[in-house]
Amino acid sequence: MNKIVIALALGGLLALAPAASAQTAPQSVIHVVTVTWKPGTTPAQIQAALDGAKLLPSKYAGITRVWAKSIKVQGGKANAIAMEFTDEAALKAYTGSDAQKDWYKVYLPIRGESTTFDITN
């Protein structure tokens, strides 16, 4: 009898696992930018662009976190920046926002080439 109860309990837990996983999957969007800088760009200019990216959560409510300290970068890129948006709508609304325009003042003049990835569940 105990074996039947244990088997039923385990079966119930296994059946509920996918539903629990779906409920805890975040709806946020991770926006990853890999970048190379224009020739002649100074370390101070690069740091200003990275620092500007880190300030974005305080300037745009739809951005919750920014990571700008690259540990490993491949493919000829110099840096990577990751921004976490609350959801896809926040990412779309960021385009053309005052926060983006302000950051672009320090970022775009020194950006050589960039690649962007937007990732969500």
Model-derived segments and spans:
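Short S/T/G/P-rich N-terminal loop/turn motif that feeds into the first structured element of a domain
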Residues: 6, 16-79, 86-93, 119-121
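Residues in and immediately flanking transmembrane alpha helices
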Residues: 15-16, 100
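Positively charged n-region of N-terminal signal peptides that target proteins for export
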Residues: 1-4
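Surface-exposed, polar helix/loop patches in the mature regions of secreted/periplasmic/lumenal proteins
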Residues: 81-121
